[in-house]
Amino acid sequence: ERVLPGADRMYPDTDSAPIPLDDNYLNNLNKNLPTDVIDNYKILKEWGVNEEVYTYIFSKNLFPIITKIVDKIGVNPKYVCAFFGHEVKFAVGHYQGPEQFNFERIFKLFKYLKSKGITFELAEKMLPELIMHPQMDFESILTSMNFKKYSKKEILSKLPLLNEKFSEGKEIISNIKRKNWVMGKLRNIAIGNIELTDLSKEV
């Protein structure tokens, strides 16, 4: 409705009355606003995240991506924060790509690994290629790394022979040394196929 000039005219520079905003529209706007840093800090504390990674997370505005990985993929938040604060920080600082690294690719990487039944520990080994060759797809990165899928049963089937090999010529066998040696031999085929903590319990 056209508003006539006069004392009752609220907006002199317009001819129409203001249109009230829908509540849903306002709520959607609020969802897109950045959460207060103090609130994010409290969430990191609740997750039990080591404070040494806070600065990197906030300086690179990684909190939204971290919560996305936690909420949509179901990865342990403490692990995700440590991954960004240590592994990603190191890789970005040591490997040079043709363009600035897009941290959103980490979300896509975790999503891909979960869809393929590959443990997230392999993500660390994939980071250099991810940074240096941003256009390379994840399947190609795995191929370049010579990654092969092994079942837990296949990996554990190698234990008897490795234990026998370690024990050869030894009168006294240190269980700690044996375990470390076997873990070292199995590490390359285990990463991505079985959690190393789970493998350690079996060894």
Language-model-detected regions and their locations in the chain:
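Charged, compositionally biased, marginally structured helical/coil segments
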Residues: 1-203
